[in-house]
């Protein structure tokens, strides 16, 4: 109704329709998003961006045929748009005969190519060369892209160390039993956490394939609820001495009310905000019945997978330097060791390699931990039509495969700085 009012007051334009489509797409209302993108296209039929936006919706819901149809139309209009080329590469497995590979390399080498476009091309070429098994050509492009990102977004790894120092200091005397009977008892979200590229999307897809579960993706509301309840900035940690029983109830109620409002229809909801493990102690006190699933993966494969992906600007800034990656990972291990000691029964850990080697055993373990009865369709997670917005969008739309295991062996010499950092 709000947008109907806006359209009556404002002159209808493609730009306005695109903005509304973006809002609905972000809210995972794919059909409504497509409706507004189509309205925009009626006004500007040659606008390449609209084709790309439609392609993005189709990719998120797993319709790769329409995805490629739309992105190819966008590329036909703007053949040298590197964002479109990157999108194309990330929407299918690239064969060695695909002309896009040499086209991207030509653009990469062109002097007039901007620094940012060269970064995008570096990651896109990496994906294309790996798909086509041209592994010996990969690393110069991958390293160039990461080095440039590291220059654009410098990161002091001491930030991760000091943040964990604070967590350990504030929760040094934490005992979950001290909070028995407190918090919001009715709240039971399922938090899926871990390092990026560790398999969290796969785990969420398996669990959310259950008829009683809605997969909400990366919600990120827990930090907001904590911040506005206790009066701290969203990402600032707080001492337990400032947390009162009524705070815990309010935090839990805020999170659960938000999830139930935005993701109605099922009794269980997953939140794949992967960094939530840092707030595990406080959230377990605020919601005694919430679940935490920590996904672990061989760090050599996990960190390589991080290194070969470009994240949203100003996020995961440790990702673009091998030494920083190793140090950050060791800090992840450090804080998980801390929580394992403080709340050993507060979460379960699942190993990515175990999951793909024996899917049913470990999928059943996950479903059982969530207090749900087993459903066979949890093993057919790739058939789910829910919208997915992560870098793993291609992988979780197909049955479990093992080609990503020991991928680090292809680049063993190039990754030596990383291996030394995680020793």
Q: How would you name each of these model-derived features?
A:
Residues 9, 43, 77, 110-114, ...:
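Structural marker of alpha-solenoid helical repeat scaffolds
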Residues 18, 22-25, 52, 59, ...:
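Position-specific recognition of the canonical hydrophobic site in helix A of tetratricopeptide repeat
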Residues 89, 101-116, 121-189, 236-242, ...:
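PAPS-dependent sulfotransferases, especially Golgi type II membrane carbohydrate sulfotransferases
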Residues 179-285, 295:
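Phosphate-binding active sites in nucleotide-utilizing proteins
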């Amino acid at each position: 109704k709000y947008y109907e009012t806006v359209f009556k007051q404002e002159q209808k334009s493609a730009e306005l329709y695109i903005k509304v489509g973006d809002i609905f797409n972000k809210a995972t209302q794919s059909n409504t998003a497509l409706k507004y993108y189509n309205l925009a296209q009626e006004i500007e039929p040659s606008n390449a961006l609209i084709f790309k936006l439609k392609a993005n919706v189709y990719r998120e819901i797993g319709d790769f045929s329409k995805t490629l149809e739309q992105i190819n139309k966008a590329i036909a209009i703007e053949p040298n748009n590197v964002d479109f080329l990157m999108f194309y590469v990330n929407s299918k497995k690239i064969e060695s005969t695909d002309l896009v590979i040499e086209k991207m390399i030509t653009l990469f080498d062109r002097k007039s190519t901007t620094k940012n476009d060269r970064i995008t091309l570096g990651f896109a070429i990496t994906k294309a060369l790996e798909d086509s098994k041209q592994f010996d050509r990969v690393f110069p492009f991958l390293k160039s892209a990461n080095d440039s990102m590291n220059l654009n977004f410098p990161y002091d790894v001491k930030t991760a160390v000091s943040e964990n120092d604070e967590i350990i200091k504030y929760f040094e005397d934490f005992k979950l039993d001290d909070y028995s009977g407190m918090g919001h008892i009715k709240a039971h979200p399922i938090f899926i956490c871990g390092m990026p590229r560790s398999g969290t999307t796969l785990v969420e897809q398996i669990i959310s394939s259950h008829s009683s579960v809605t997969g909400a993706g990366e919600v990120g509301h827990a930090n907001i609820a904590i911040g506005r309840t206790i009066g701290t900035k969203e990402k600032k940690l707080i001492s337990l001495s400032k947390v009162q029983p009524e705070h815990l109830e309010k935090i839990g109620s805020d999170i659960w009310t938000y999830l139930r409002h935005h993701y109605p229809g099922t009794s269980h909801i997953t939140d794949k905000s992967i960094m939530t493990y840092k707030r595990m102690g406080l959230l377990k006190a605020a919601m005694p019945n919430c679940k935490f699933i920590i996904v672990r993966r061989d760090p050599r494969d996990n960190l390589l997978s991080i290194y070969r992906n470009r994240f949203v600007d100003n996020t995961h800034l440790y990702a673009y330097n091998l030494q920083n990656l190793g140090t950050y990972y060791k800090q992840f291990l450090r804080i998980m060791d801390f929580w394992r000691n403080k709340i050993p029964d507060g979460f379960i850990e699942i190993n990515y390699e175990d999951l793909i080697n024996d899917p049913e055993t470990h999928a059943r373990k996950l479903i059982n931990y969530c207090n749900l009865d087993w459903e066979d369709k949890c093993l057919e997670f790739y058939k789910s039509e829910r919208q997915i917005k992560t870098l793993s969008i291609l992988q979780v739309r197909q049955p479990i495969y093992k080609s990503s295991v020991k991928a680090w062996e292809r680049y063993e010499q190039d990754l030596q700085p990383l291996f030394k950092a995680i020793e």
